[in-house]
């Protein structure tokens, strides 16, 4: 049985970020982590753990969102691009009624910014977050920084995170270890 103080956070694993024709895709490197994410999500539920799916969401043409100036429109509410990618969508459809599976809309890089994630984790006495998904050097990184600042223990599954460039991936993994004291495995 799993220690009840850990949660898996599957961050932004959507069609727009992962599918070959996604609006802001990591492409093949993002697709390669799919089986690791599914394995960890299944393991988490088997061990009575928690799976949170903090997922980027945008409204088309929002002039006030800072990402509008940086990136093309992506993860628009109610679109295919915002749906989970591949096997994760199938996994979610199968497990969405499970009370230990929680989808969380987020509008910023960090899963903690402007959400009730911290309250949900603390209500469940969770003190450790295991992060997987995309993008390692953007949303995974910002979530990890906030988790660190909020006092959570951080685990990064190296085979479960991906980003646009090899340099970004390597830099972020080192930063997790050296600046946040995260366990990278």
Where are the regions a protein language model picked out?
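N-terminal nucleotide-binding beta1-loop-alpha1 segment
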Residues: 7-13
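Short acidic, Gly/Ser-rich segments with clustered Asp/Glu that frequently serve as metal-coordination loops
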Residues: 14-20
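Short glycine-enriched, charge-decorated loop/helix-capping segments at active-site entrances
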Residues: 22-30, 69-75
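Short beta-strand segments at enzyme active-site cores
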Residues: 49-56
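Loop-to-helix element that buttresses phosphate recognition and phosphoryl-transfer chemistry
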Residues: 27-39
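Active-site loop signature of alpha/beta-hydrolase-fold enzymes
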Residues: 16, 59-60, 162-163
């Amino acid at each position: 049985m799993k220690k009840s103080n850990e949660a898996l956070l599957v961050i932004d694993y959507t069609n727009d970020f992962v599918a070959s024709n996604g609006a802001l895709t990591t492409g093949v490197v993002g697709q390669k982590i799919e089986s690791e994410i599914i394995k960890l999500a299944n393991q988490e539920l088997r061990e009575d753990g928690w799976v949170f799916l903090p997922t980027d969401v945008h409204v088309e043409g929002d002039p006030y969102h800072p990402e509008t100036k940086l990136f093309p429109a992506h993860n628009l509410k109610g679109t295919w691009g915002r749906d989970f990618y591949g096997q994760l969508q199938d996994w979610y459809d199968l497990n969405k009624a499970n009370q230990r599976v929680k989808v969380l809309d987020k509008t910023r890089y960090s899963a903690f910014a402007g959400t009730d994630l911290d309250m949900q984790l603390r209500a469940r006495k969770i003190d450790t977050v295991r992060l997987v998904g995309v993008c390692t050097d953007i949303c995974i990184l910002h979530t990890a920084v906030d988790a660190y600042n909020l006092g959570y223990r951080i685990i990064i599954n190296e085979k479960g995170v991906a980003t646009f460039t090899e340099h970004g991936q390597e830099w972020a993994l080192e930063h997790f270890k050296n600046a946040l004291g995260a366990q990278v495995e």
